[in-house]
Amino acid sequence: IYKNAIIRIYDTPILYFPKFFHPDSSVKRRSGFLQPRLNNSKTLGSSINIPYFKTLGSNKDLTFKPTLFEKFSKFEKEKYILQTEFRKKEKNSSLIADFAFLRDYKSSTNSKTKNINHLFLNYNSKLNIPNFLKIRFEANIERVTNDTYLKVFENNLFDTPLLPASQTTLNSNVKLYLEKENQNLTTGIEVYENLGVKHSDRYQYTLP
């Protein structure tokens, strides 16, 4: 634990904490600030990410990851992204969700400002049903409210294993895996969203 701690950027005081502590490698789980990250982008300018890890019990935690930006034309008022990751692990299930929110963003193609956000989620569960050896349920959600969101904020969405593989196509799905003696069955639905296409043509559905 540090007393009267000051965070400086290029010798300029940015934040002051009467008391400051952070996770230690010798401690398995402990709430505290994680290592800050600096970023510089031609599109968004300079920014700093200051993550805070919070334990919520033995099987769940939350990481608050705000990103602060310098004054830039794309931001009408607020100049920060509020990003949060939640994780929960049970005996037969796991959940991880990442959400971010930004107010009054002005894109290069629209003079009006609007609130934008993202939601990435993965849920896995093992089910017990008679006559089946293994049953697994999986759900994934990839959602953004701005078509160029992933391209613009790629370098600012830190440390999320849920970041979509493509910046132009989102994949949300629900799947059920069943295993029986000498038999395997996979069923579900997948939805692909092409961010470069307008209206209903941007969605493609895949069924078993």
Set out the residue ranges of the language-model regions.
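Outer-membrane beta-barrel proteins and related beta-barrel translocases across Gram-negative bacteria
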Residues: 2-208
